[in-house]
């Protein structure tokens, strides 16, 4: 039925298929074939299909068939019409001697020694998931024996999932032609992952499932590295798909119904859940150096006033905010966590008003008088920046000498105005007393399981500033943990990643730093994009995991193929011309030797499984607590 023809220089193998009496066994594009000899099984994939006859001979046979009819053709003529050739590419090798996959392909298959056939159910399951087999089952014979003993076959595979998982280090993440595809989501820790797809083809569903599997690891304490103290998932949610459940969408709030302390959503939507905080920054808890850096990122240039702004002591800055918040609380009769736009703007106006006066003072010779007055007040057990500013202002009005000193201030009206409008815009749009602070970020890394930044609830400008600030603090804290030999993993999941990772040369850009250096500090990156061609090739080519769904743009497909040669040939063709929702072409370095085509389950179905598993875990924990209690009594 199959015959080996030849092997081309680029290792493409040409096979002849005599199809007249075997049409049901005719392989399709993308199917796997095995080339077997006395030493090994070589797994190959069908890349191309052609007629065996050349064009002119085929044309003559077809004309003859049209003239006299198919029934009157001789057997040999019929066979000639149904002879097909296939180009197949080698993927990996199973050594019969070692009874395990070697991954290498060095020898040309010999015509007389090679049998060509479709793989069996056991062989295909073994080839697809070899990387995740437990050591004792990496021997193919033992693997087969286990399947036979447990009566696992292609007809009952879905019913036998629990038994099957006993031999794998991983989870069933998807299926390929009714065969389970195993994946160990530990591989997402401290790794770079690229997810590529047009809108509507299942990338969000796939990512939700992967994140759910990571959460399962966290709750079952099943990380491969037992030194991991915590793993925090952070989602930069551009389209508002991950947090809340509504008619169109199931959010992660369903996962944390009984574990709300592990979950945080930062959003500007009016939600009353206990796990919700505003998508804002509490600038009172930031140093003036940090705020100056945010201002530079937000407005793109450094101005003279920033130098003097950074000289403002953190104690002074905090006191200014405390006075502003206290005043607005008294006026509004609201707690600061309940402040709305009107209250935030009043606090901001108060800050700006006295910041103007402060900058004039500290950029002049009055700075020393101001500092002495603060010290005197502090000795009395008090600290009120505004009172000192007002008192000094009164003294200046009564003293020509002090007025002259103030006029010599380095910052004049125009300089102060430049920082004033910038800071005002920043505070109006991004400040809230219940917003994030630096210490909050550290606490999240140490204690939370998932944080979602609902960027759909903010404009692009505000969302970008908060995302950069949050990412920078994570990077800095994980650097600290690394130096202390403490292992806290963070998985940063970015939608619209092409807007963040377009230029590898932006060395000071925090997103590029995460992509280049994050792995060292246990920061994983999941970059989701519709436009892989817009991401720097230097970043794209360094991805460890690739999940590619349907892409239409030629530049995007070529960029992916250039970054990872496994996405060439037939895979490249299918990415463009098979727009099947949920179909994914998955590759993971370094152990997985070829792209696996698969279709993800639905997130809602996986969520139901997760809930049942969590109920079982809760029941087990309760039984253990009762046992400990009984033992203590005895």
For the regions a protein language model found, what residue spans apply to each?
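P-loop NTPase motor domains
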Residues: 226-228, 240-251, 272-513, 584-588
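N-terminal pre-Walker A segment at the start of P-loop NTPase domains
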Residues: 128-181
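Conserved P-loop NTPase motor module
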Residues: 465, 580-634
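Conserved ASCE P-loop ATPase motor domains encompassing nucleic-acid-directed helicases/translocases
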Residues: 1-138
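Pre-Walker A adenine-sensing motif
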Residues: 176-186, 440-441
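Hydrophobic positions on the alpha1 helix immediately C-terminal to the Walker A/P-loop
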Residues: 206, 210, 466
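Conserved lysine of the Walker
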Residues: 203
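Conserved ATP-driven motor cores of ASCE-family P-loop NTPases powering translocation/secretion/packaging/pilus
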Residues: 77, 514-597
């Amino acid at each position: 039925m199959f015959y080996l023809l030849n092997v081309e220089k680029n290792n493409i193998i040409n096979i002849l298929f005599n199809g007249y009496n075997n049409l049901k066994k005719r392989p399709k594009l993308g199917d796997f074939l095995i080339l077997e000899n006395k030493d090994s099984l070589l797994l190959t994939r069908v890349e191309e299909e052609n007629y065996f006859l050349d064009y002119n001979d085929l044309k003559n046979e077809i004309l003859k068939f049209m003239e006299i009819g198919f029934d009157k053709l001789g057997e040999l003529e019929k066979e000639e019409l149904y002879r097909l050739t296939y180009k197949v590419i080698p993927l990996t090798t199973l050594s019969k001697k070692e009874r395990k996959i070697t991954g290498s392909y060095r020898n040309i298959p010999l015509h007389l020694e090679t049998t060509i056939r479709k793989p069996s159910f056991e062989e295909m399951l073994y080839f697809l998931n070899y990387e995740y087999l437990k050591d004792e089952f990496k021997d193919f014979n033992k693997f087969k024996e286990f399947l036979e003993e447990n009566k696992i076959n292609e007809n009952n595979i879905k019913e036998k999932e629990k038994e099957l998982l006993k031999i794998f280090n991983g989870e069933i993440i998807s299926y390929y032609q009714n065969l389970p595809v195993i994946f160990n989501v530990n591989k997402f820790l401290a790794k770079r992952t690229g997810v590529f797809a047009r809108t509507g083809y299942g990338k969000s569903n796939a990512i939700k499932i992967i994140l759910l599997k990571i959460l399962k690891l966290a709750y079952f304490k099943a990380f491969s590295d037992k030194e991991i103290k915590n793993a925090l998932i952070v989602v930069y949610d551009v389209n508002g798909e991950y947090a809340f459940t509504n008619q169109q969408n199931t959010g992660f709030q369903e996962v944390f119904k009984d574990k709300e302390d592990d979950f945080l959503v930062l959003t500007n939507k009016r939600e009353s859940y206990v796990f919700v905080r505003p998508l804002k920054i509490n600038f009172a808890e930031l140093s003036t150096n940090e705020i100056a850096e945010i201002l530079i990122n937000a407005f793109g240039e450094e101005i003279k006033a920033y130098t003097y702004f950074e000289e403002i002591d953190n104690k002074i800055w905090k006191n200014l905010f405390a006075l502003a918040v206290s005043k607005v609380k008294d006026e509004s009769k609201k707690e600061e966590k309940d402040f709305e736009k009107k209250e935030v703007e009043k606090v901001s106006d108060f800050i700006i008003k006295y910041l103007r006066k402060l900058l004039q003072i500290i950029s002049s010779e009055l700075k020393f008088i101001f500092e002495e007055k603060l010290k005197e007040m502090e000795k009395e057990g008090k600290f009120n920046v505004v009172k000192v500013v007002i008192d000094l202002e009164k003294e200046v009005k009564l003293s020509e000498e002090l007025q002259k000193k103030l006029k010599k201030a380095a910052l004049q009206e125009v300089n102060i105005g430049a920082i004033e409008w910038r800071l005002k815009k920043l505070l109006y749009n991004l400040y809230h007393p219940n917003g994030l602070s630096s210490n909050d970020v550290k606490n999240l890394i140490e204690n939370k399981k998932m944080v979602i930044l609902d960027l759909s609830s903010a404009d692009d400008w505000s969302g970008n500033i908060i995302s950069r600030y949050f990412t920078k603090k994570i990077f800095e804290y994980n650097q600290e943990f690394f130096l202390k030999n403490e292992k806290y993993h963070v998985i940063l999941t970015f939608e619209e990643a092409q807007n963040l990772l377009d230029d590898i040369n932006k060395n000071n850009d925090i997103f590029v730093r995460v992509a280049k250096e994050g792995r060292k500090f246990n920061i994983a990156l999941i970059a989701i994009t519709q436009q892989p061609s817009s991401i720097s090739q230097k970043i794209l080519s360094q991805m460890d995991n690739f999940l590619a769904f349907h892409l239409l743009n030629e530049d995007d497909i070529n960029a992916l193929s250039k970054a990872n040669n496994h996405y060439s040939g037939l895979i490249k063709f299918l990415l463009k011309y098979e727009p099947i929702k949920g179909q994914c072409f998955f590759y993971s370095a370094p152990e997985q030797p070829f792209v696996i085509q698969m279709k993800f389950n639905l997130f809602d179905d996986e969520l139901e499984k997760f809930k049942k598993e969590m109920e079982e875990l809760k029941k087990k924990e309760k039984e253990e607590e009762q046992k400990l209690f009984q033992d203590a009594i005895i």
